[in-house]
């Protein structure tokens, strides 16, 4: 029973951490432990560590940490790429060394030795494609082609010049401070890829996420079948029920079978738990980015719209406060009337109307052309189509 509760607690803690990390910043979790855990994982832990280093080693220690942070987070570097290769290689090596001796088994055939290796190779190829493909770098030679791909919405995108590159900024583009270049349909800079994710390599990035989710899921299920096969081949259930008198119910057998598996095949159990957690994380990332692709939105635009709604909310609140203050000052000189009493309520109502209006504008996405067309733009970027080249030529003429 203790093992059973330990596994339940472990699963609940893992689920809490995963949800907090992925979704803790959502408005629905505001003021909850999920938000605090998200802050601690993303900012708080590093902030406390920086303060500790400053307290122990002074400003010199802090400067060293900040210089390491600048190299790791603010400049292109292959650190996370090396970590990815190390994780991929070591996980496959440990899986092959600990589990391939049980293939073929009761549930798995010999073919899985080769399909697993092939799946890993495909994953590495997709990783390399995403790392070294052009995300859609905008320069003086091709800027007209990217400008003709998407119109300006004059809300979050308007005609302006990049202050660094000194070229016109196409709609949906952004200057990446890490790569020091403008990227068309900029989504985000991915440290794992050491590359930006933009118009021309989003399809590789999505394929990478989907394939690695399936790869980790495949590994989890395969190891599960190997362990189930060992339980069947060694007649563990029969031994427990006949020789140890354990009741045949699932509730009685499950904790003891799990305890036996953890003690006998601990490496496989650890690998299975690790792959299950990673597959859950990858499923969350893929679902998030798939939703962005289906609605023709980018991560960068999501933050831009959030800032736009927040700014409009603050402006409407400021206007309502100013109007209420003005009404209050006038009421000091005049006898309060029914009109002045409800003025504050009307002011709050108009502020709410402004918020709703800003939210409605944000939901009217100029670039959303329907799910099928949106996905086709990911697979076949607009700037690479002949129609886009013809438009840019006509504009230049």
From Swiss-Prot:
Catalytic activity: L-cysteinyl-[protein] + hexadecanoyl-CoA = S-hexadecanoyl-L-cysteinyl-[protein] + CoA
Active site: 190 (s-palmitoyl cysteine intermediate)
UniProt GO MF annotations: protein-cysteine S-palmitoyltransferase activity
Name of the top EC class for this enzyme: transferase
InterPro entries (alphabetical): Palmitoyltrfase_DHHC, PFA4/ZDH16/20/ERF2-like
Domain (DHHC) ranges: 160-210
Main location: endoplasmic reticulum
Alphabetical keyword list: Acyltransferase, Cytoplasmic vesicle, Endoplasmic reticulum, Lipoprotein, Membrane, Palmitate, Transferase, Transmembrane, Transmembrane helix
Transmembrane segments: 2-22, 37-57, 83-103, 117-137, 207-227, 269-289
Compartments, as annotated in UniProt: Endoplasmic reticulum membrane; Cytoplasmic vesicle membrane
GO-annotated biological processes: positive regulation of response to oxidative stress; positive regulation of response to salt stress; protein targeting to membrane
Database matches in Pfam families: DHHC
Record EC number: 2.3.1.225
Keyword Acyltransferase: yes
Protein task: Palmitoyl acyltransferase.
Recorded superkingdom: Eukaryota
Family: Belongs to the DHHC palmitoyltransferase family.
Domain description: The DHHC domain is required for palmitoyltransferase activity.
Name of this protein: Probable protein S-acyltransferase 17
UniProt key word Membrane: yes
Annotated membrane topology: Multi-pass membrane protein
A GO CC annotation given for this chain: endoplasmic reticulum membrane
């Amino acid at each position: 029973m203790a093992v059973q509760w330990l596994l339940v607690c472990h699963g609940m803690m893992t689920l809490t951490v995963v949800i907090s990390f992925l979704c803790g910043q959502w408005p629905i979790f505001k003021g909850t432990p999920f938000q605090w855990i998200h802050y601690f994982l993303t900012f708080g832990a590093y902030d406390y560590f920086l303060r500790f280093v400053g307290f122990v080693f002074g400003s010199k220690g802090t400067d060293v940490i900040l210089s390491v942070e600048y190299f790791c987070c603010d400049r292109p570097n292959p650190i996370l790429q090396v970590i990815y290769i190390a994780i991929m290689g070591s996980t496959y090596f440990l899986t092959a060394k600990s589990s391939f001796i049980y293939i073929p088994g009761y549930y798995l055939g010999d073919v899985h030795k080769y399909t697993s290796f092939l799946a890993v190779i495909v994953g590495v190829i997709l990783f390399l494609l995403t790392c070294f493909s052009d995300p859609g770098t905008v320069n003086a030679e091709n800027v007209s082609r990217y400008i003709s791909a998407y119109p300006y919405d004059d809300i979050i995108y308007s005609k302006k010049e990049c202050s660094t590159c000194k070229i016109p900024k196409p709609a949906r583009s952004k200057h990446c401070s890490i790569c020091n270049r403008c990227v068309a349909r900029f989504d985000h800079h991915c440290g794992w890829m050491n590359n930006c994710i933009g118009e021309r390599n989003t399809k590789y990035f999505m394929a990478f996420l989907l394939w690695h989710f399936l790869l980790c899921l495949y590994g989890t299920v395969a190891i599960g079948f190997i362990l189930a096969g060992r339980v069947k081949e060694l007649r563990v259930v029969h031994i427990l029920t006949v020789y140890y008198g354990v009741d045949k119910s699932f509730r009685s057998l499950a904790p003891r079978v799990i305890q036996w598996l953890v003690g006998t095949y601990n490496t496989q159990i650890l690998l299975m738990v690790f792959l299950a957690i990673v597959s859950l994380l990858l499923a969350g990332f893929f679902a998030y980015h798939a939703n962005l692709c289906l609605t023709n939105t980018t991560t960068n635009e999501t933050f831009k719209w959030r800032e736009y709604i927040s700014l409009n909310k603050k402006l409407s609140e400021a206007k309502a406060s100013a109007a209420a203050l003005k009404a209050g000052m006038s009421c000091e000189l005049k006898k309060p009337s029914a009109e002045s009493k409800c003025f504050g309520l009307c002011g709050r109502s108009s502020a709410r109307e402004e918020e709703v209006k800003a939210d409605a504008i944000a939901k009217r996405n100029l670039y959303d052309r329907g799910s099928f067309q949106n996905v086709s733009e990911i697979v076949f970027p607009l700037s690479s189509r002949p129609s886009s080249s013809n438009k840019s030529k006509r504009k230049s003429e």
